Amino acid sequence: MKKSLSISLSFVALLLAHSSCLQERVERFEQDRVIAFDAIFSNPTKSGALKSPFKVWGLESGQTAEMVLEAESFSPVDGIWRSEREHLWGPDDSMMSFFAISPSDVPATFSRDKGVCVNGFDISASAPDLKFATLTGVRKPQADLPTSIVFQSALCDVEFRAKSVASDDISITITKVTLSDVATTGDFCTLPSPEWTLGPKKTEFVVFEGNVLLTEDAQSLGEVMSVIPQNLKPRITLRYNFDSGMGGVIKDIDVEINRDFKWRVGKKRVYTFKVSQNLGLTSDIVIAEEK
């Protein structure tokens, strides 16, 4: 009987010890918050879930500002952006700052004064839509929840449109639009504010080539372009065909325009040509609209 009681007491003690250990593990697990993100992309004209993986540099706030994440890639897993290796938040009162760039395979570096930098970016046909995010002074979440991080484009979207202000019997068809002296390379850094340093390479952009018969309503000429933000005064060449409605068609009329352009980070510029029946543009050459 004593032996049986001894075994029972030993079992109870073992069970209590296991329960205590399990409770300790649960409490420790609850305290350990894995760094994860809820990532979205937002611009003045479009927003939605981020689609490309991104990489993050994460610093603890404080005197030392220890680097916790260093060019760590994050990808979506069941709607939450996680890294392949788990990284934990610090104590409950800890704060962090995150600096991110997308897509994750873009060559980038980080420094505390300039943030994330991408050098030698080339806005070629295959160039990605470069996005970035800066999130400072973020506290450790109270629950096992992802940290919201919002990306914006490092580029500027540009759209060209045209409308006719000619009389109804006049037909005007736009066939080509080009821009000269557009910088296509540059270096981008996110701190202290997002800024581009333009490279020496400049080129002529063919904005549109085709046939668009103008109406009194503005129509898009080609697709929206993503360009490196810059201030420039390009030569704009607008080519069109003119039908007077009296059996005479004049083809390939070229009109050159010089206008100051200002393309800013994360913005969209819309330019509208107003073409008249005077074989040229009206005095209101281009309407620039920023969104």
Kindly give the residue locations of the regions a language model identified.
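Sec-type signal peptide cleavage vicinity
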Residues: K2-S6, S20-K291
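Bacterial N-terminal signal peptides
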Residues: S8-A17
